[in-house]
């Protein structure tokens, strides 16, 4: 066994396999919350008010106190002290570069994101459901896509819908609207933090930062009441986006991307710097978690989620999805977490998971418990050392986009139970991260979990029920794979490596989707076969004779698949063990042909197999001999079925 966290197998009988998992676990205290100077944000979030002006009392100031390593606020808007000239100069230089290279299209988007209610702006993150939401919520804006010609001299305000609001709480989607409003309007303002830090907007730091011409009328004439850090628009966008993401977790990452885009548009507009935008995101994340943890919001958040699932998502989406490109979303969101600043602080700090942060994932990863969600946040957090991000509680280092992709590491053994009858992510989910760590994965329940990362976890993999799909060649990391009762599916064009032993019990199924000669399952250790093998040939691929489908270093003597099915090939193809591989071929031995003839001439043989089947010869041992599986032909495409159980019981 290669697994660092060994899989210890106990064979109770030929059909019973009890795995005992032992991982070199990270101590459970690793995910314990650490308070800030103000306590825990989720406990004291209502202390964010204009009357509380210190970081020890006001959490909106305290959570951003990392900025004090770069800047000391002055007594006035323009007399603060720069502590880290390199970083603050870089901050303004980045803003200048973005404003000086923006396109007209980017300017127009920046204008719309400035002038529209941020709640309305976030609707586009719903993708194909955006228009359905606008109609169902009676959402509206008076800021049209066509920017008025006189916008360079006239400041336009968003008048909302016909009722003067962005959407109606009395509409068919009113619970969602009310949820967003509640989050936005509860101790969520950036005003206290702006007043405390007194850090100027970028255009006041440098003339190289240019404001979009249509937003010049929006420039405040009173710099003493117009701080840049943190960005209020960004804060509002993330609050609205996270609210919608909670209700519609199917759009979780797209909503995050949309919020990050609005934040970036604040830089494009010339109104904010990258650090301003980062600060807005950090604060909004803490506020959102606080609202989700507040028991007074329990019924409201439930109602919003249920309304989204039962009303909005049951409709056919008609809108164009502007955020359908996952790779682009990932690239943009990840960059905007740090805006390319280098790690100039302590890079050795362990990840800290804020108290209550797990609530941010409770609809996105509903099949995990609260503790497991904290481990997900722990394993997907940003490294330490980036400017502003290292707050005591850990809000700045959360990467919710990555967390929505499941674990980033198995720091201890992980057991996942998915009940497909509950639908949604309970029935099917993708874990796209590259999973490391010494822990093992055990999959239980009837749902399907898909692993698609370049995984290196070493604890091994156990499937007890349901389905586990490998969508990458290294999906199962390093270690033994055990299929006791479920379906392991291979769907990786480059083939699948099982870096250890593979053991399949009688109730297990291995299903392969083979689309090329390279699409092979390579078992580096010993194979022990039982149960069912299903081979689907796809993409019109027809293999040559003796093409390897499964390779292994050795085969457990006396083991074989009870049943084999081949789909997608002409009926003359058969599966066979040839040395240290299972291959497919149209060739048959003389012994095979003779025994085939005998099997169709006697009533006894017919009784032993399904009607119309042709039985293959008995196998020899796996030391290099060849054994053939019988074939049932269904039309043009063959289905090879070898039922070992019926022959043994004859």
Regions found by a protein language model. Give the residues of each.
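Extracellular beta-strand/loop-rich repeat segments of large surface/secreted proteins
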Residues: 441, 470-546
């Amino acid at each position: 066994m290669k697994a660092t966290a060994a899989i210890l197998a106990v064979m109770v009988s030929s059909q019973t396999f009890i795995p005992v998992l032992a991982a070199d676990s990270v101590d459970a205290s690793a995910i314990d919350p650490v308070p800030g100077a103000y306590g825990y944000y989720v406990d004291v979030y209502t202390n964010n008010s204009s009357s509380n002006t210190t970081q020890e009392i006001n959490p909106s100031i305290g959570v951003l106190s990392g900025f004090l390593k770069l800047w000391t606020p002055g007594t006035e808007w323009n007399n603060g002290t720069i502590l880290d000239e390199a970083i603050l100069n870089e901050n303004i230089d980045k803003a200048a570069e973005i404003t000086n290279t923006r396109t007209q299209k980017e300017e127009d988007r920046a204008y719309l994101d400035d002038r529209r209610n941020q709640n309305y702006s976030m609707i586009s993150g719903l993708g194909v459901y955006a228009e359905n939401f606008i109609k169902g919520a009676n959402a509206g804006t008076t800021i049209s896509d066509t920017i008025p010609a006189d916008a360079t001299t006239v400041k336009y305000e968003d008048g909302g819908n016909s009722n003067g609001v962005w959407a109606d709480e009395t509409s068919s989607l009113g619970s969602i609207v009310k949820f967003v409003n509640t989050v936005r309007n509860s101790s969520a303002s950036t005003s206290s933090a702006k007043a405390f830090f007194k850090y100027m907007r970028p255009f006041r730091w440098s003339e190289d930062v240019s404001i979009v011409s249509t937003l010049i009328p929006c420039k405040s004439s009173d710099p003493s009441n117009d701080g840049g850090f943190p960005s209020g628009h960004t804060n509002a966008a993330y609050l609205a986006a996270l609210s919608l993401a909670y209700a519609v977790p199917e759009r979780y990452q797209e909503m995050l991307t949309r919020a990050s885009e609005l934040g970036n548009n604040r830089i494009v507009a010339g109104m904010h710097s990258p650090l301003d935008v980062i600060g807005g995101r950090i604060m909004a994340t803490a506020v959102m978690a606080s609202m989700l943890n507040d028991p007074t919001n329990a019924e409201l958040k439930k109602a919003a989620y249920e309304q989204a699932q039962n009303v909005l998502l049951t409709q056919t989406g008609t809108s164009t999805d502007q955020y359908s490109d996952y790779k682009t979303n990932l690239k943009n969101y990840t960059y905007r977490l740090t805006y390319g600043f280098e790690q100039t602080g302590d890079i050795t700090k362990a990840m800290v998971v804020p108290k209550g942060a797990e609530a941010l994932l409770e609809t996105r990863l509903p099949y995990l418990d609260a503790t497991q969600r904290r481990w997900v946040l722990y394993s997907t957090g940003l490294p330490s050392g980036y400017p502003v991000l290292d707050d005591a509680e850990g809000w700045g280092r959360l990467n919710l986009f990555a967390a929505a992709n499941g674990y980033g590491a198995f720091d201890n053994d992980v057991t996942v139970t998915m009940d497909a009858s509950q639908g949604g992510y309970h029935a099917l989910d993708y874990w796209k991260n590259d999973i490391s760590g010494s822990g093992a994965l055990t999959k239980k329940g009837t749902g399907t979990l898909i692993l698609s990362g370049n995984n290196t976890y070493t604890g091994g993999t156990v499937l007890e029920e349901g389905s586990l799909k490998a969508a990458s060649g290294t999906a199962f990391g390093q270690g033994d794979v055990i299929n006791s009762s479920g379906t392991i599916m291979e769907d990786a064009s480059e083939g699948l490596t099982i870096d250890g032993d593979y053991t399949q019990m009688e109730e297990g199924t291995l299903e392969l989707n083979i689309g090329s000669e390279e699409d092979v399952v390579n078992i580096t250790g010993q194979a022990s076969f039982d149960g069912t093998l299903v081979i689907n040939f796809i993409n019109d691929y027809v293999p040559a004779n003796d093409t390897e489908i499964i390779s292994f270093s050795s085969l457990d003597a006396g083991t074989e698949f009870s049943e084999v099915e081949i789909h997608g090939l002409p009926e003359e193809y058969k599966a066979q063990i040839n040395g240290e591989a299972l291959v497919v071929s149209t060739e048959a031995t003389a012994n095979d042909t003779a025994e085939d003839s005998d099997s169709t001439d006697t009533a006894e043989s017919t009784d032993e197999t399904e009607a119309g089947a042709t039985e293959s010869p008995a196998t020899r041992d796996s030391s290099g001999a060849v054994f053939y599986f019988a074939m049932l032909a269904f039309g043009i495409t063959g289905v090879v079925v070898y039922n070992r159980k019926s022959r043994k019981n004859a």
